[in-house]
């Protein structure tokens, strides 16, 4: 398969690009230049790998979920344990890389957006480590849902700005973070949390997250002597999925499945299934599939999981959908909750609600596969942050 994206202008087919105001163009170009240089620099790579190993705790295990496999009665199910990273999710793979980039560029301050709070915590963590000032924008609704993570960020020395505009969720936090970056661009680096935003952000985040798929490939081959038949990951903006999928894109015998949040159901208005129900538009500096009405107004995304309710999706996922290399599906709040409970009871692993969407789809897929086939789920984060809201949800039902 001939796949080489993005092109030099940052496009993935028709998607991606740089839809930014003139005031940001210089910074985006400066970032691209610095990133290219860093990727060629052995000392930078060495420092990054040092922190990934000794600070983040990589490599993360590829765990054979024997009980879950028996329960499903089909393919062997493996879990890529990104929940075991420092800070409890895949997010830190990217924040550590970008924070080192910020230091390299001579920036003193970092700004970021966060939904579930995981990216905010991972950003505040690396800022504490590297002595950078940290400002995090978070939607008012998410601040309410994720009080513990807000406290964590503040403990780590970050300033958390609550955003009341719009629906008070991730999209609004990104708007404010971008605004802040425009006016502080001389001394501030923006750590985008997913494969979104203007080029080179989707590429930078994908590349830093690709450690997930690269490790998985090596680990699976060592265990089974071949590549897995299927790989499953959840998708909000899509960074854990992109990090998992990208190293497998050329291996056409490996089926790739991206799982979005169907919320209350894709037939309702309450979902975040952008690739299932969206249409093409521009948001936050990039062309991608979006949830929008006929007038092009962005619609609110809904999911029980704060990390999946973004109304867009990374430009590279948009392309991978169009060319059919990845097959995208959606899972409802109910199905995700069932999977959350099942994995917890069967394996003693409490997954994040985001990751539970991937688990839920894998539970449908595994029984349709042969017993000698293998399926890998990207377990993108741990569920500690969700236990409280799940308890509330179950009491209400």
Swiss-Prot record:
Q: Which residues carry this modification: N6-(pyridoxal phosphate)lysine?
A: 91
Task: Write out the GO MF terms.
Answer: tryptophan synthase activity
**Pathway assignment:** Amino-acid biosynthesis; L-tryptophan biosynthesis; L-tryptophan from chorismate: step 5/5
According to UniProt, the reaction catalysed is: (1S,2R)-1-C-(indol-3-yl)glycerol 3-phosphate + L-serine = D-glyceraldehyde 3-phosphate + L-tryptophan + H2O
Q: What class of enzyme is it?
A: lyase
Q: Check the record and name the InterPro entries matching this protein.
A: Trp_synth_b_CS, Trp_synth_beta, Trp_synth_beta/beta-like, TrpB-like_PALP, TrpB-like_PALP_sf
Pfam families (UniProt xref): PALP
Enzyme Commission code(s) on record: 4.2.1.20
GO CC annotations on file:
cytoplasm
Cross-referenced CDD domains, in alphabetical order? Trp-synth_B
The domain of life is Bacteria
**KW Glycosyltransferase (keyword) present:** no
What SUPFAM superfamilies does this protein's entry cite? Tryptophan synthase beta subunit-like PLP-dependent enzymes
Cofactor entry: pyridoxal 5'-phosphate
| Keyword terms | Amino-acid biosynthesis, Aromatic amino acid biosynthesis, Lyase, Pyridoxal phosphate, Tryptophan biosynthesis
Q: Which family does it belong to?
A: Belongs to the TrpB family.
**Database matches in HAMAP family:** Trp_synth_beta
Quaternary context: Tetramer of two alpha and two beta chains.
Q: What does this protein do?
A: The beta subunit is responsible for the synthesis of L-tryptophan from indole and L-serine.
Q: What protein does this entry describe?
A: Tryptophan synthase beta chain
The organism is Bacillus cereus (strain B4264)
Q: Which gene encodes it?
A: trpB
């Amino acid at each position: 398969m001939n796949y080489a994206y993005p092109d030099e202008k940052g496009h993935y087919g028709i998607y991606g690009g740089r839809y930014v105001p003139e005031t940001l163009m210089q910074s985006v170009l400066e970032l691209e230049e610095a990133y290219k240089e860093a990727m060629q620099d052995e000392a930078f790579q060495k420092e990054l790998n040092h922190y990934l190993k000794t600070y983040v705790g990589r490599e993360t295990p590829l765990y054979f979920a024997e009980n879950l496999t028996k329960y499903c009665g089909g393919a062997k199910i493996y879990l890529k344990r990104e929940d075991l990273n420092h800070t409890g999710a895949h997010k830190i793979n990217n924040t550590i890389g970008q924070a080192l980039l910020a230091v390299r560029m001579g920036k003193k301050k970092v700004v970021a957006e966060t939904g579930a709070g995981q990216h905010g915590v991972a950003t505040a963590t690396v800022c504490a480590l590297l002595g950078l000032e940290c400002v995090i924008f978070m939607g008012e609704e998410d601040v309410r849902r994720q009080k513990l993570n807000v406290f964590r960020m503040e403990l780590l020395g970050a300033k958390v700005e609550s955003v009341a505009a719009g629906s008070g969720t991730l999209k609004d936090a990104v708007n404010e973070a971008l605004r802040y970056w425009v006016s502080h661009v001389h001394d501030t680096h923006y750590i985008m949390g997913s494969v979104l935003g203007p080029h080179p952000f989707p590429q930078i985040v994908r590349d830093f997250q690709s450690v997930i798929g690269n490790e998985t490939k090596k680990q699976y081959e060592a265990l089974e002597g071949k590549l897995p038949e299927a790989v499953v990951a959840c998708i909000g903006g899509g960074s854990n999925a992109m990090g998992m999928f990208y190293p497998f894109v050329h291996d056409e015998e490996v089926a790739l499945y991206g799982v979005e949040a169907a919320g209350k159901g894709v037939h309702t208005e309450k979902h975040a299934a952008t690739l299932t129900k969206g249409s093409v538009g521009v948001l936050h500096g990039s062309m991608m599939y979006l949830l929008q009405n006929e007038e092009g107004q962005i619609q609110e995304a809904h999911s029980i999981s704060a990390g999946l309710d973004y109304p867009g999706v990374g430009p590279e996922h948009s392309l991978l959908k169009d060319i059919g290399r990845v097959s995208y599906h959606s899972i409802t709040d109910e199905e995700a909750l069932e999977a959350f409970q099942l994995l917890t009871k069967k394996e003693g692993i409490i997954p994040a609600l985001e990751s539970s969407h991937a688990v839920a789809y894998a539970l449908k897929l595994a029984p349709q596969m042969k017993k000698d086939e293998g399926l890998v789920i990207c377990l993108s984060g741990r569920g500690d942050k969700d236990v409280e809201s799940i308890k509330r949800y179950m009491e209400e039902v």
